């Protein structure tokens, strides 16, 4: 029976025989004594195995197979290590090479590789310390998301990935079709989608929100956590075409309740990774972003500042900052606007509310001025927006008017209007992008490094 390296290091039984399985990260030798570092992914640091050729009968053929990247099963005695930087090591009794690696063609060597290079081999980059740390932090965040909502009386629901609705009204959707390409080459307006698989136009979902609202109108508090897709041709460090979204919906929640929940969730997740991923976070602090831990602690320990969009524009207009896009009332806040508010004005997270309705989604509840909506964005230092949400429009007539005003297909949304026809209630929700949170939590500068196999414009590895 073998144990994970994490368990062995957590509960070491000195002078006991242990068996580990893993991959060789490094190999060096000093005469007849060899040293290999083995990692199985369970923890950042692997464990050193000492191979003494004089004490044990190891064949020259087998020793030559011990190269970086090789998978191995090894048994030996767990002892205290005299070397600096490690408490324990294994005095090897026997080993079995499971999968050999040709050192001449293996792309990962004992050196720091650029993120650009590693993006070309996403199937292998997970074997580096950096991407191992990112993966473990992502795993912890995902687990804690479920833990948080389950502890707070939410029901987890699964919403469709294939849909006929544009949940955001932006039109940036991937089409799903089984029609022959020669038919698709014609203008889309000439295609009869009755011949298609679903008998109508179908798309990959951009949000689970609308379907989530249906369940919130019966279960009161729900959350979705799944993949979403945006056909937005943006080659930036903050956008991906496929990403995972956390979307809670709560009946009887007003905007202030929504903000309080989002703030509490964010602080809970950041506290969890600092407390439970300390080794990985220390590594990321040292090698990826200096000041990372302090940045996250600032979010955890701050009371988020709540300001209106109008106030935000006033602050930006009165600043002496030379923004790339000049701020004025009616423009959507840009990343440098958001960062100015969080990093230079308030020096902590900021919640901007009451946005102009002209660039917000159709489902957001209108304010009494009929110019702004009860939307909210949570902005954090370094990256800007990390959570976006709103109080939803629960008035049937107002929602119908807004749909018509935006020339959306009201027939496709008739089921959504039913939620207002039958037992409508105030409700709110928000979306938190997992990849953007991972990006922020780990300090990596590009969202492509926060997801195992990134999907971006002109990029579809595997």
Swiss-Prot record:
GO biological process: asparaginyl-tRNA aminoacylation
A Pfam family per the record: tRNA_anti-codon
Catalytic activity entry: tRNA(Asn) + L-asparagine + ATP = L-asparaginyl-tRNA(Asn) + AMP + diphosphate + H(+)
Chief location bin: cytoplasm
GO molecular function, one term: nucleic acid binding
Subcellular location: Cytoplasm
Any Gene Ontology CC annotation: cytosol
The organism's place on the tree of life at top rank: Bacteria
Alphabetic keyword roster: Aminoacyl-tRNA synthetase, ATP-binding, Cytoplasm, Ligase, Nucleotide-binding, Protein biosynthesis
EC numbers on record: 6.1.1.22
Keyword Nucleotide-binding applies: yes
Complexes and interactors: Homodimer.
PANTHER family found in the cross-reference section: ASPARAGINE--TRNA LIGASE, MITOCHONDRIAL-RELATED, ASPARTYL/LYSYL-TRNA SYNTHETASE
Family: Belongs to the class-II aminoacyl-tRNA synthetase family.
Protein name (database record): Asparagine--tRNA ligase
Upper taxonomic lineage: Bacteria, Pseudomonadati, Spirochaetota, Spirochaetia, Spirochaetales
Record gene name: asnS
């Amino acid at each position: 029976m073998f144990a994970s390296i994490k368990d062995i290091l957590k509960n070491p039984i000195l002078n006991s025989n242990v068996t580990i399985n893993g991959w060789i990260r490094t190999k060096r030798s000093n005469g007849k004594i060899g040293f290999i570092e083995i990692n199985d992914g369970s923890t950042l640091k692997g464990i050193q195995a000492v191979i003494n050729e004089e004490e044990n009968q190891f064949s020259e053929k087998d020793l030559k197979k011990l190269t970086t990247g090789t998978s191995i099963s090894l048994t030996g005695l767990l002892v205290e290590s005299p070397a600096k930087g490690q408490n324990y090591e294994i005095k090897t009794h026997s080993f079995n090479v499971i999968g050999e690696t040709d050192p001449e063609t293996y792309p990962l060597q004992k050196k720091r590789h650029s993120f650009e290079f590693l993006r070309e081999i996403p199937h292998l980059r997970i074997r580096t310390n950096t991407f191992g740390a990112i993966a473990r932090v992502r795993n912890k965040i995902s687990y804690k998301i479920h833990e948080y909502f389950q502890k707070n009386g939410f029901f987890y629901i699964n919403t469709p990935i294939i849909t006929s609705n544009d949940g955001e009204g932006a039109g940036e959707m991937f089409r799903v079709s089984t029609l022959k390409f020669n038919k698709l080459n014609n203008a889309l307006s000439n295609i009869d989608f009755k011949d298609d698989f679903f008998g109508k136009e179908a798309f990959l979902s951009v949000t689970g929100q609308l379907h989530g609202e249906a369940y919130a109108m019966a279960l009161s508090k729900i959350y979705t956590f799944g993949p979403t897709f945006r056909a937005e041709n943006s080659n930036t460090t903050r956008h991906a075409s496929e990403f995972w979204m956390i979307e809670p919906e709560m009946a009887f929640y007003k905007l202030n309740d929504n903000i309080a929940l989002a703030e509490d969730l964010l602080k809970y997740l950041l506290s969890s990774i600092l407390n439970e991923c300390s080794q990985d976070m220390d590594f990321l602090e040292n090698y990826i972003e200096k000041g990372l831990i302090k940045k996250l602690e600032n979010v955890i320990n701050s009371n988020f500042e709540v300001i209106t969009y109008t106030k935000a524009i006033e602050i930006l207009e009165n600043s002496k900052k030379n923004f790339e896009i000049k701020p004025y009332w009616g423009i959507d806040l840009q990343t440098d606007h958001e960062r100015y508010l969080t990093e230079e004005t308030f020096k902590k997270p900021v919640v901007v509310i009451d946005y102009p309705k002209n660039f917000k989604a159709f489902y957001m509840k209108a304010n009494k001025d009929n110019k702004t909506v009860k939307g909210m964005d949570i902005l954090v230092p370094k990256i800007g927006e990390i959570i976006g949400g709103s109080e939803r429009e629960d008035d049937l007539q107002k929602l119908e008017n807004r749909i018509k005003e935006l020339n959306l297909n009201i027939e496709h949304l008739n089921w959504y209007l039913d939620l207002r026809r039958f037992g409508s209630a105030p409700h709110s929700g928000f979306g938190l992008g997992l990849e953007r949170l991972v990006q922020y939590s780990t300090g990596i500068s590009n969202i492509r490094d926060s997801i195992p196999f990134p999907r971006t414009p002109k990029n579809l590895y595997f």
